[in-house]
Each structure stands twice: as structure tokens, then as C-alpha cells.
Amino acid sequence: MNYLRTSPLHDAFNTLQPAWDESHGMLTASRVGGADAAIETLALADLSCLPKSGLKGPAAAQWLVAQGVPVPPEANSWKALPDDGVIARLGRSEFFLEDGAAGGMATRTRIALGTGTAGVYPVIRQDAGILLAGERSNELLAQTCNVNFAEIDPERRGAVMTQMIGVGVIVIRTHLPKLPCYRIWCDPTFAQYFWDTLLGIATELGGGVIGTETLLK
């Protein structure tokens, strides 16, 4: 029997009358009750279903290159993987990978590494993954973090490791079609508190929640 994974944000959607769907072995809220928030203004989405992998060690970068994975050249930066995936370099020798909706490089990397090899060690990644999008995104970030994301050049593809409302996060800026957005990852232990706080601020700014239906196609 195949058991579905549960998002660390699953309970946060119970009051939103979601339409549940399965994506990558996890129940996800493809739509929320009523109308989804206007993504152009300010919207939050749960993308925790996307497969992740991690690795670190003095030979991690060389091992990734040998697997055909594009490696960010600098610490605290990221590159795109095929099919909307992401690889972030966290410091000099640790890497975080996430597949896009149709990608598989993070999954293949995790399987290939197994329990590790000389100088390369697997890191279990079960992060809650959140998308923050819309014209008022930087206003929300300004209220929750001391990093001024509005001044960061998105073309430099920085991977920012910082704290938001007391929770350690990884943040990158990327783009939906014609719309800038941020991807945020945090420890699943703090996911409910983190989401509830962001959603409260987003609601005050005229935003809300969107389902994954239009994001994972």
C-alpha cells in the first residue's frame, strides 16, 4: 500500500475548504474555497510537495558535476534545474535541490547518492516550501525580516539564509510568467506558526492563499 505524504501545512488549509489533489505523493490544496487570492497583488501557496534532496561535504560539488547537475559557482547562490527545479549552494560545501512539477533531478540525485560516498554525505530535507508572489511581496518581507529584499538584484540569483519572524529560512527570488515571486523554505517544525503569521500579514495587505492548480502544471 502506498501512503500519501502529509504537508507540514496540511492543517492550515482545513478552514479554507480546499479541493485536495495528489502531487508527488502528497495531498496538496489545488484550489481553495471561494476564489483564490489575486496572485498579482499578494498570494501565498504551499509547495511542500515538491521533492527535495540535500548533500554536503568537501567533495559534494565535484560529485554533483559528475552527475550532470549544474552547480552554482558561488556560496549562497542558486541555479535553475530542468523543468523549474532549483539548486542552492548553502555555504561552500552544502547543497539543497528541489524538483519542479515535472522535474526529477533532485530525486535522481538523492537516489544516486544513497547513504553517501567518499567526501559526500546526504542531508535529509523535509522543508516546508512556500511561494510568495505579488506586487506587495516586499511589503510583507519588510515586516517579517531585516533583509531588504527590494534592494537585492534578482539577476544575481542569491540564496539568502536568514530569519523571518524568528524562524530560519532559505529565500530566493524567482519568477512566474510576468510576475516576480519568492520561494521560501523553513523547518517543518515551525511551518504552521510561520504560515499563520505570514498569512495574517498578507490578509492585512489585501492578499491571501492560492492553490497549486496553476503553479504545478
Description of each model-found segment:
Residues 1-217:
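Basic, glycine/lysine-rich polyanion-binding surfaces/domains
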